[in-house]
């Protein structure tokens, strides 16, 4: 059964400044959810909390499989992943960078090779699999981050500003990758972006972050 996510009354403050103010929403359908809003509206914070990278000050973050609540343990964390803008790179090949998530999960060599090659093909980087990742452009690095996430075949994928600071050509490529993922039903995807036009192009469900709350558009 596919994962569902319910957040209820989520609050978060930094140094006494509220960022999230009683956020509640159910991410229960497949497709692409897009969180929009101005810089500092809490989009990235909400993604980190949903991806279990940070904990809320108050409120609940609950994952379901069917009607069953799932423990927030390592098994759940292996079913979700967050891609940040400007991913960290290792001084090794594109292939090894894309394989990182699988390797730390103990993936077998042949299965890892198959999944990584498929992910690199999907994002258009298979021809650079043996290149050093440090030679990639910023747009290619962002695509590599998506490939690294895709290789582990997450059931829920979080993308934080996936086209921030990349050129128009790579922005179009990344958007097409997301649309193709949606077409194939690969993951339930939750994206944070300040670009309203991009939100309209990608989203099945558009959500506005305003004063630390989620408003369905």
Model-derived features: where do they sit?
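H-loop/switch region of ABC-family ATPase nucleotide-binding domains
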Residues: 193-194
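The feature captures the beta-strand-to-loop junction immediately N-terminal to the Walker
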Residues: 36-38
């Amino acid at each position: 059964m596919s994962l569902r996510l319910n957040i209820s009354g989520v609050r978060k403050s930094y140094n006494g400044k509220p960022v999230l103010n009683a956020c509640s929403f159910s991410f229960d359908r497949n497709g692409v959810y897009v969180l929009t809003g101005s810089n500092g509206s809490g989009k990235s914070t909400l993604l980190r909390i949903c991806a279990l990278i940070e904990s809320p000050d108050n409120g609940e973050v609950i994952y379901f499989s069917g009607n069953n609540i799932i423990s927030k343990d390592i098994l759940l964390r292996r079913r979700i992943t967050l891609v940040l803008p400007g991913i960290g790179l290792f001084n090794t090949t594109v292939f090894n960078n894309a394989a990182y998530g699988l390797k730390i999960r103990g993936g077998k060599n042949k299965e890892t090779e198959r999944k990584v090659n498929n992910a690199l093909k999907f994002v258009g980087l298979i021809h650079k699999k043996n290149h050093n990742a440090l030679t990639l452009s910023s747009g290619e690095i962002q695509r590599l981050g998506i490939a690294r996430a895709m290789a582990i075949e997450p059931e829920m994928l979080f993308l934080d500003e996936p086209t921030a600071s990349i050129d128009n050509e790579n922005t179009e490529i990344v958007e097409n990758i997301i649309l193709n993922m949606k077409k194939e039903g690969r993951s339930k995807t939750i994206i944070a972006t300040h670009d309203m036009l991009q939100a309209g192009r990608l989203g099945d469900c558009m959500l506005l972050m305003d004063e630390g709350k989620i408003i369905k558009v």
